[in-house]
Curated annotation (Swiss-Prot):
Lineage: Eukaryota, Metazoa, Chordata, Craniata, Vertebrata
Name of this chain's protein: ATP-dependent RNA helicase TDRD9
Every Helicase ATP-binding domain range: 144-310
SUBUNIT field: Interacts with piRNA-associated proteins PIWIL1 and PIWIL4.
Record's function text: ATP-binding RNA helicase which plays a central role during spermatogenesis by repressing transposable elements and preventing their mobilization, which is essential for the germline integrity. Acts via the piRNA metabolic process, which mediates the repression of transposable elements during meiosis by forming complexes composed of piRNAs and Piwi proteins and governs the methylation and subsequent repression of transposons.
GO cellular-component term (any): nucleus
């Protein structure tokens, strides 16, 4: 035995690779320097092949083997090197066990602890309880004796033998009868299993749930200090043990379903095994399973006894509840006739196999009849109790399909229940209820019912032998759920669900020979196929040595390359520190950072945990907690199959103008919270109705609220608190907060960065035939004479928005939606929704006539001239007219006769966008005459109900005189409407009963109000950040510049009836002031390129006004050909309307809608740069249409999570956020949040041209550390040393709020934290909000992309080491090293 061990010696003793010095052994004389201990000499003789160097070092030293030279940049050797690392660390562990074997605890039965008085004596269970007659009950005393006599016992028994429910009760009753203390924990792999078993026991024993028996699953804990038997999930127990670094809280640990080789299960076994051999040797551990590989587990928990490893005791529970017969497809020849071969590499359920399952369910009535002894059976003679059927399917999609097949069988009297992870507790309970008499219960389940849920009345199991497993793509490390064949172990577990109360039947829907030859025996352990991030963080918290040293002792150790990769990913996220000296970077270990400690305690992914911490840093913790909670659980937004478009529109509404799925979650959650706080959702029905109206699942949003509170509680131990909500006086605060939150999302989800390809403007303009891309979509495969069906086409798009016009042009049609003239320039939501319809593959069908039929029945075939005629249907004017074919995009309103105009501004829409009218004499006279003519007539009320887009007459009072003017209705609200006066450009609220019908003659004159947009200007970064596209300050300044006096405008171009102009203001005798120049000078705006259409219009206008306007042909003059087309068109439309053509007898399927400005996404990381990228259809950004195609600056998208398809060729992005369109934003954010960066310089070394971001370069191996995630960017704005310094200052500001140590952030007061948060916020805003915008440059790509170490070391400006020893900093962000530029 050991004598006089200090605390440090104890810590070193249980840490692999540490040296323990000055140790004396009792009973042995001190060894001379040249003499090895006797036990070790004896051991070396017995194990001659063991490494002699290792023998000489034990027991006083356990040295880790030298780190292999290969790192991430170089390929690892074959499997032999993987086994070498495992064997070396296992040898070290065995050497430690030699010491353990010298001091074994006494074995044998006996109670180890005195009675611990319960706080409530009445809680002591009755010992007269009669246990159910299950196989485990026959060997009750023997099992209890084994458990008390052995440290570890393995119980192997058939499903239904009573292991999970009865055995823990036996131990509890055994201790109670002896008035001895016990505290028993039983793990279950799934929440539903832990909660349902605890509920069943409490009901069976008539105990209060949460008294003697309780459960803890995730956030929910139903237990008290009196609880002596608690069921919990594997993860909950693991978290408890890792935090305590001991098992001593419990007397007995039952680990159920150990055959389910999840990552948590394997790590729990590792930790329990480790602690059993160190500081928790009196705890009893029981492993249980129906399909366990007993020898593997027994050897794993072996202990040294007299220099031999003694396996753990295995106890076989004899007997099964009832016999279970197995059948395969070969045995079902009477209902299965397909001869399709089954292939291991193609797991799939074919339609005929679904039909086999349905046929089986129908046949069970005959089987029940035969077993009951009845000779006849009729439809009316159903027995009152029909046995239940459990069907195992791989996922929710398959469950829904099978559910639909079964619900169509109404006459068969079936009650069908789905059972999967997203089912609520109430829905889960339905599975356990008895069916209505005469009905058969059918349970459609994923593998959740394989082991976690036992439905006692199941007699039939139908198993498709499939499952979905989470795997990691080998190249990208992104996860994907893959359909695969279930293992024989899992299928046997499923079979065991039958036969609980009577003889059972199991039908495996695969051929018998396929089962024998292809189905794998065991499932591949998760530790060998899934990310190890959370496991390695827990290893670091345990502080028992290098992760590879501890994981080498796992039941199925992960490969060294997987450990190495996970360590690098944890360094990338910031959970482990990046070494300041890159050559010292240990690819197998790292220092745990403050962030890493937080992540290890949070029940969310590493990136979501980082989101919470960065939210704390930048003062948006509340929003980040909501997002982290929402993204960790099932999405509470619902998009029903038939109402997907409505659900999508609702989600877009919640996101506002942010274009962020994450911000939509925040706004929806807060809207729900606000309604509850106002008392609007007191009744459950009111809350459910609110959820249905807003496409939100109430049960799921409640779960988010619970997790939000849990996260809030957990981070409080790290001195992070959600601050009180004070009223904010700064009007720009909400916009700044939104931007900061978007930046925090980018920081948390680095490197999930994406950009968009640029559309070809010239091709897009041609494809749209000059139509406005912000209001128009294109349809293809239009049938001949498509204009006849314009009403059908209008109705197809009714759910998108108000259709203004449809232009039919051969086999194409252009659908244009109405734009509110008082809203800013942007792609209409209707256009996004229309393109979304195409993405959802919504069928667009028209009921049509054959072209030959039309030509044969109307005008003797003369209408054939209209077959290729371009026709415009104007719903506003209610006209259908032929159009002249034109390829000219020039839009020249007849109201503009000169390029210089004097105007009055009547309505400012936003900065640079306004309405006005000309104030020259000619126009003033025209408006005066028009007003007089309108007001001379006897006006009549509207014949139809007012609706948006309707043109009518509305009153307006000017100089105390009320007159009627032409107006367009914008909105209708109650008894009033907002109208827009189309000849002046202003708007007003008018009572509905004051609106009048407009006579037809007043619709012919073009509207005289003009819409203007200042050319070559866009909002600055400051305006984008501090407002809704433009800041409040910019709005105020622009309104002051254009209001109160006439303006001179110089027309640059006319695009889609909008005049792009330069605006000049005269003030007194001074020269004219260019409004754009003022806004740029004051930092509200910056110069921008005009679009291709605008530049084309400029050239045409320049030539047009160079000639005499009088010599130009008048496009309004009618030609005889056009009149003839009009006549034929009218005849054809009348024939169609009067049904002379008869009922349509054909269907035409249209293709589209399309918009040529729709953007495609691509990744910025090296590994994914050329992979196809898809955004999930539920995301707001599943449709992105360019608002400013002339702006060539990169637009950035951030994804919260990524997955890949089964081949790894396509990436799927989830929960995306479109970042503000700020020049240089992708580069600045990448440099701000990258662990390491290397700047690129031009050939002369005078300016920075780009940056390479990632984990950097290892000079020792001469290879990049994590090349797959490297991001190469070329700057599109000029960045200099000052920008790099600003980024470093901001990184240092972040570090101050997330640091360890005695002066760390855990010990800061609230005032100091608030001060540091405000400092970080201001530094962040200052990085982007500059008075003078960064200069735009043409991107120059580096000649050696993704190559590190390209800078001359003499030009690198080394940063001062942070506080602490060099290279040992645990800061979240290291400071970047700028490159010295030549003068």
């Amino acid at each position: 035995m050991l004598r006089k061990l200090t605390v440090d010696q104890i810590n070193d003793w249980f840490t692999i690779g540490k040296t323990v010095t000055n140790v004396e052994l009792l009973g042995l004389p001190p060894a001379f320097p040249a003499e090895a201990p006797r036990e070790e000499v004896q051991r070396s003789e017995e194990v001659p092949n063991e490494d002699p160097t290792a023998q000489a070092q034990v027991p006083v030293k356990a040295t880790a083997p030298a780190r292999p030279a290969s790192t991430s940049g170089r390929s690892l050797s074959q499997r032999s090197s993987e086994m070498e690392y495992i064997n070396k660390y296992r040898q070290l562990e065995e050497q430690e066990l030699d010491i353990y074997g010298q001091d074994q605890p006494p074995s044998g039965p006996g109670l180890r602890s005195p009675l611990a008085k319960l706080s409530n004596v009445a809680c002591i269970p009755e010992t007269t309880y009669k246990y159910p007659d299950l196989p485990i009950n026959r060997c009750k005393e023997e099992v209890i004796s084994l458990i008390e006599s052995n440290s570890v016992v393995i119980i192997h028994g058939a499903t239904g033998s009573g292991k999970s429910t009865q055995l823990p009760q036996y131990v509890l009753d055994h201790y109670t009868q002896r008035s001895a203390f016990c505290n028993i924990v039983v793990t279950q792999p799934r929440k539903i299993g832990a909660s349902s078993i605890a509920r069943w026991i409490s009901k069976e024993r008539s105990w209060t749930l949460g008294g003697l028996v309780g459960y803890q699953v995730g956030l929910e804990k139903i237990a008290t200090e009196d609880t002596r038997l608690i069921y919990m999930t594997t993860g909950v127990l693991l978290q408890k043990i890792v935090s305590a670094k001991s098992l001593m809280e419990f007397t007995h640990i039952f680990i159920d379903e150990v055959h389910e080789r999840t990552e948590e299960m394997d790590f729990l076994l590792l930790v329990v095994r480790k602690l059993l051999r160190t500081n928790s040797r009196f705890v009893k551990v029981v492993l249980m399973s129906a399909t366990i590989n007993c020898k593997q587990f027994a050897d794993y928990f072996a202990v040294p006894v007299q220099n031999k490893m003694n396996p753990a005791y295995v106890f076989e529970v004899e007997g099964k509840p009832h016999a279970i017969e197995e059948y395969y497809l070969n045995d079902l020849g009477h209902i299965y006739h397909s001869g399709l071969p089954y292939r291991l590499e193609e797991p799939v359920i074919t339609k005929d196999v679904y039909e086999v399952a349905v046929s089986l369910i129908q046949m069970f009535d005959d089987l029940d009849m035969k077993e009951s002894g009845n000779k006849t059976w009729s439809g009316a003679q159903f027995v009152s109790e029909r046995s239940s059927v459990l069907v195992f399917l791989p996922g929710l999609g398959e469950i829904n399909y099978m559910h639909e097949l079964l619900t169509n069988m109404i006459h068969k009297r079936l009650q069908v229940y789905p059972l999967h992870s997203s089912v609520t507790l109430e829905e889960q309970n339905n599975v356990f209820l008895s069916p209505v008499p005469g009905y058969r219960k059918i349970i459609l389940s994923t593998n959740i019912a394989e082991s976690s849920v036992t439905v006692p009345d199941v007699k039939y199991v139908i198993d498709f032998c499939l499952t979905r497993t989470l795997v990691c793509d080998e190249d990208t490390n992104y996860q994907s759920l893959r359909l695969s064949w279930a293992s024989k172990t899992s299928c046997d577990q499923r079979k065991g669900r039958a036969g609980r109360v009577s003889k059972g039947y199991c039908y495996r829907l695969i051929p018998r020979d396929f089962w024998d030859s292809a189905i794998p025996d065991h499932v591949v352990p998760e530790m060998l196929r899934c990310p190890l991030g959370s496991t390695i963080l827990k290893v670091k918290l345990l502080d028992m040595g290098e992760p590879r040293a501890l994981l080498a002792t796992a039941l199925s150790p992960p490969s060294l390359s997987d450990i190495e990769r996970t360590i690098l990913l944890l360094k990338e996220v910031g959970a482990l520190a990046v070494s300041g000296q890159r050559e010292d970077e240990n690819p197998h270990d790292g220092e745990l950072t403050f962030l890493g400690r937080v992540l290890a305690q949070l029940p969310v992914s590493q990136q979501l945990g980082k989101l919470v911490v960065l939210g704390h840093v930048f003062g948006c913790l509340d929003e980040c907690l909501i997002i982290a909670a929402a993204l960790s659980l099932k999405n509470f937004f619902t998009m029903p199959f038939r109402q997907h478009l409505d659900g999508y529109r609702n989600k877009v509404h919640f996101s506002g103008s942010s274009r962020s799925d994450c911000l939509a979650l925040v706004e929806a959650f807060r809207a729900w919270q606000a309604c509850r706080q106002r008392g609007e959702l007191r009744r459950p029905k009111d809350e459910l109705d609110w959820g249905r109206l807003n496409y939100i699942q109430i049960k799921r949003i409640r779960e988010v609220a619970e997790l939000y509170e849990e996260l809030k509680n957990r981070i409080s131990q790290f001195n992070m608190f959600v601050g009180p909500h004070h009223p904010v006086l700064d009007q720009e605060y909400p916009y700044k907060q939104r931007f900061i939150l978007q930046v925090v999302l980018a920081g948390a989800f680095y490197p999930n960065y994406f950009t968009f390809g640029q559309p070809d403007e010239e091709m897009a303009v041609r494809e749209l035939a000059g139509k406005d891309p912000k209001t128009t979509v294109v349809l293809k495969h239009i049938p001949p004479y498509g204009f006849l069906y314009y009403k059908q086409l209008q109705s197809l798009f009714r759910q998108c928005g108000q259709v203004k016009s449809i232009v039919f042009d051969g086999a194409k049609a252009f659908v244009e939606f109405s734009r509110n003239p008082t809203e800013r320039f942007k792609t209409l939501p209707a256009v996004n929704l229309a393109v979304k319809m195409s993405q959802l593959k919504v069928s667009l069908e028209l009921s049509v006539h054959a072209a030959e039929e039309i030509e044969g029945k109307v005008q003797g075939g003369s209408v054939s001239k209209l077959r290729n005629t371009r026709v415009n249907v104007d719903f506003q004017k209610q006209t259908v007219d032929p159009m002249q074919v034109s390829f000219n995009t020039l839009d020249r309103p007849r109201t503009v006769a000169d390029l210089l105009l004097t105007i009055d501004v009547t309505e400012v829409v936003e900065v640079g966008h306004f309405w006005g009218y000309r104030i020259d004499e000619r126009n003033a006279e025209l408006l005066k005459q028009l007003t007089a003519e309108i007001n001379r007539l006897e006006l009549v009320p509207l014949p139809i109900h007012p609706h948006p887009d309707l043109v009518c007459l509305a009153p307006f009072t000017d100089y105390n005189k009320e007159s009627y003017f032409r107006a367009q209705i914008l909105y209708v609200s109650g008894n009033s409407a907002e109208v827009f006066f189309v000849d002046y450009g202003n708007r007003s609220h008018v009572d509905l009963d004051l609106l009048r019908e407009i006579p037809c003659q007043f619709l012919e004159l073009p509207f005289q109000a003009l819409e203007f947009k200042i050319c070559k200007m866009r909002p600055s970064a400051k305006s984008l950040i501090c407002g809704e596209h433009w800041s409040g300050g910019a709005h105020g300044r622009f309104a002051a510049l254009v209001g109160g006096c006439p303006l001179l405008v110089k027309v640059f171009s006319i695009v889609h009836s909008v005049l792009h102009v330069d605006v000049y203001r005269y003030s007194g005798a001074q020269d004219a002031v260019n409004v754009r120049d003022v806004l740029i000078r004051e930092g509200y705006a910056e110069l921008a390129e005009e679009s291709y259409e605008s530049k084309q219009s400029y050239e045409v206008l320049k030539g047009f006004f160079a000639k005499s306007v009088d010599t130009m042909p008048d496009g309004s003059v009618s030609s005889p050909l056009k009149d003839d087309e009009k006549h034929l068109l009218r005849i054809l439309l009348e024939s169609f309307a009067s049904n002379r053509l008869g009922a349509p007898n054909c269907k035409a399927v249209l293709h589209g809608p399309f918009n040529p400005y729709e953007l495609k996404c691509h990744s910025l990381t090296r590994i994914s740069k050329f992979r196809c990228v898809w955004i999930e259809k539920e995301s707001i950004n599943s449709v992105v249409i360019s608002d400013s195609p002339a702006d060539l600056h990169q637009r950035m998208l951030v994804a919260a999570s990524l997955s890949v398809n089964e081949t790894g060729s396509t990436m799927l992005l989830r929960e995306t956020s479109l970042m503000p369109h700020i020049p240089g934003l992708p580069a600045l954010l990448s440099m701000l949040f990258a662990p390491v960066m290397e700047l690129r310089v031009d050939r002369e070394g005078k300016c920075y041209t780009g940056v390479l971001c990632g984990l950097g370069w290892n000079s020792a191996t001469e290879a990049p550390i994590l090349p797959e995630h490297d991001i190469e960017l070329a700057f599109d704005v000029r960045l200099n040393v000052e920008d790099i310094v600003e980024i470093n200052i901001l990184r240092a500001a972040i570090n101050k709020l997330v640091c360890d140590g005695p002066n760390g952030s855990k010990y800061l007061g609230p005032e100091r934290i608030a001060q540091l948060q405000e400092n970080a916020r201001q530094k962040l805003l200052g990085l982007f909000c500059r008075l003078k915008p960064r200069e735009k440059i043409t991107p120059q790509w580096h000649e050696k992309p993704y190559e590190w170490n390209q800078v001359d070391p003499r030009l690198i400006m080394e940063q001062a080491e942070p506080e602490g020893s060099p290279g040992k900093s645990t800061s979240l962000y290291q400071l970047h090293t700028p490159v010295v530029l030549s003068p």
